[in-house]
């Protein structure tokens, strides 16, 4: 017999995931308030518990966002379940200096490309994201990693909470002309001083860098026709939950997914509002969201679980294992549990007909 739940915690990456809509509109809190269940962000917990965004050690936690930390967590033996996925089309690019003569990725043969390394991190998801994005961009142009030189850029400040210290948002500066925050300062500095010829950027940062004249996009990986090339931290974004919690409280997990399904359906008809919510969630201007993501990205925020998604997670896991970001293998298909989402869709359909 499951115990009664009075609190649920949540944590969402600052990315384009449907949970931000449900949270912004108050729909999640509204749903669980019916049973006097309080929803709280993990930042309301002691600092040492903030690591749950990456470790998933907090039992009553829903997480939504990039797939690399959850893959790492599962590889470390933490029993979680993937209960939903969304596909954000956009936001992966290779950039060079604004005045560089380089016009295509093919011209990067023999050149140096920046690869950030956050030394204290539990899982260096930014490095993993950049490395896969660069390698797949090279592959799309007939090149391999052996054709370029990766330049490590060590960053010794963690962006994951420690036992006593909150995460720090490092690598950002303020543009005096626009007031916009300039991301990826270590990479930008290496680019501008000639230490490297190119950098990888994603999640709208590439648009900011080009808009501010800091760098120039020479390739958008998200435009590649084969979706397998685009697999990365945000392709797909995934929603995860502690497996024991899900087994003991399947009704609560289903209700959570029902709210996300309805939020995704609402998003299809509300582009401008979705842009506003995502700009706020990702801490960038609205025009950056509009330029970084496809014009119909708001129509692809309904959670799903598909064979494509399972294959994408298997591809990502295999990449992380081959490149030393995770140590242990696991069964992706067994990690994914579609039962909650299937039930959520059925109940939403019935309720819509009433």
Task: State the predicted function of each range.
Residues 68, 159, 164-167, 173-279:
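Pocket-lining segment of extracytoplasmic ligand-binding domains
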Residues 3-163:
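Short, glycine-/small- and polar/acidic-enriched structural segments
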Residues 318-354:
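Conserved C-terminal helix/tail region of periplasmic/extracytoplasmic solute-binding proteins
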Residues 81-88, 149-153, 214-233, 331:
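Short beta-strand->loop
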Residues 247-325:
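Secondary-structure end/capping motifs
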Residues 33, 224-229, 300-307:
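Short, solvent-exposed loop/beta-turn-alpha elements that line the ligand-binding surface or hinge
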Residues 34-42, 143-150, 282-294, 327-334:
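Short, surface-exposed acidic
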Residues 1-6, 351-354:
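Short, low-complexity disordered leader/linker segments with a strong preference
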